[in-house]
Amino acid sequence: MKPSEVARLQRYLRDKFGTERIILGPKTRKDGSVEVSLGGEFIGIIYRDEEDGEVSYAFHMAIMEMDLPPAA
């Protein structure tokens, strides 16, 4: 991903979730994806897809069961 794409995605996510604590980067990975952090903690990866001239982005976030609060 180009730095301009990363900056646009970061602004979109910050606006959508209402926080400036979301950070993308620091740089694009070899496969064209970029890491997403919230307050310094890694939370997921954004993948870029281009098909038939249209670009889309997929955000993947894995949640470990041990990180969840106890069941009620």
Which residues does each predicted region cover?
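Terminal leader/tail segments of proteins
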Residues: 1-72
